[in-house]
Swiss-Prot record:
Catalytic activity, as annotated: ATP + H2O = ADP + phosphate + H(+)
Top class in the EC scheme: hydrolase
MF terms in GO: ATP binding; hydrolase activity
Recorded GO CC terms: cytoplasm; cytoskeleton
PANTHER family with a match to the protein in the record: ACTIN
Subcellular location per the Swiss-Prot or TrEMBL entry: Cytoplasm, Cytoskeleton
Function, as annotated: Actins are highly conserved proteins that are involved in various types of cell motility and are ubiquitously expressed in all eukaryotic cells.
UniProt-recorded name of the protein: Actin-1
InterPro entries: Actin, Actin/actin-like_CS, Actin_CS, ATPase_NBD
Length: 140
């Protein structure tokens, strides 16, 4: 891994349907996956299969028959912060395989995103993920 890549900013475009994530300076996103969180419909149905309490993205999509799916972003606006946090966690640790505290983070937001939502995004990035720097850009 080159020195530039180690400190490259992370860019995350949170869409209502798909989440796109990668590194600033790259030609294309490294990860594109559905913006969904799934939870088992029935407890115990997957006993012995290493059942998790939630699944994100493609894994949730592939197990949708036994999961209740939720879309935490509606019309570009985050409506479920716990699930959104799960999507960001999945983005950093599973898709990009980075430590968010080592990279500046750029997130996109919908043009009509309420100020309170921007504040909540900022709070989660700094307090939960310990991002060293954070910027919110309006989706164009």
């Amino acid at each position: 891994m080159s020195m530039e890549e180690e400190i490259a900013a992370l860019v995350i475009d949170n869409g209502s349907g798909m989440c796109k994530a990668g590194f600033a300076g790259d030609d294309a996103p490294r990860a594109v996956f559905p913006s969904i969180v799934g939870r088992p419909r029935h407890q115990g149905i997957m006993v012995g299969m290493g059942q998790k309490d939630s699944y994100v993205g493609d894994e949730a999509q592939s197990k949708r028959g036994i999961l209740t799916l939720r879309y935490p972003i509606e019309h570009g606006i985050v409506t479920n912060w716990d699930d959104m946090e799960k999507i960001w966690h999945h983005t950093f640790y599973n898709e990009l395989r980075v430590a968010p505290e080592e990279h500046p983070v750029l997130l996109t937001e919908a043009p009509l995103n309420p100020k309170s939502n921007r504040e909540k995004m900022t709070q989660i990035m700094f307090e939960t993920f310990n991002a060293p720097a954070f910027y919110v850009s309006i989706q164009a």
